[in-house]
């Protein structure tokens, strides 16, 4: 009889197992993938997030350092469009530290290619 495993461990194994994990060896996002996300459909979603970020930064009193972290960035399209959208807000962009938390080596490659001109750091945990 097999032991039960906690749900979080099952999900982690199903998505990120080094050999058979759903996100590890392929890109499941987009026209040839299994699903599509809002940033792939239209740039407007990311532009709205960018506008909100600028407004939030202003409400915070324009801090010199603002960490912006995207969790599971897929193809990296949203981070790309956010950086493009804020390019005219120089003071805001200079205050931002951009991070992408990603576990999938395949998706990291895609994200880095898409965001090659943007100053982004990739992380594998929030600690």
Where do the protein language model's features map onto the residues?
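Rossmann-like AdoMet
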Residues: 1-71, 75-120, 124-125
């Amino acid at each position: 009889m097999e032991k039960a495993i906690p749900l979080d461990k099952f999900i982690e194994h199903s998505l990120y197992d080094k050999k058979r994990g759903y996100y590890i060896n392929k890109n499941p996002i987009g026209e040839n993938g299994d699903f599509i996300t809002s940033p792939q459909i239209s740039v407007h979603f990311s532009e709205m997030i960018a506008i909100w970020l600028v407004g939030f930064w202003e409400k915070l009193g324009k801090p010199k350092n603002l960490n912006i972290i995207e969790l599971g960035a897929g193809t990296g399209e949203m981070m790309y469009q956010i950086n493009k959208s804020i390019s005219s807000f120089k003071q805001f962009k200079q205050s931002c530290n951009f991070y992408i938390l990603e576990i999938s080596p395949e998706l990291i490659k895609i994200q880095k290619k898409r965001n090659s001109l943007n100053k982004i750091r990739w992380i594998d945990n929030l600690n």
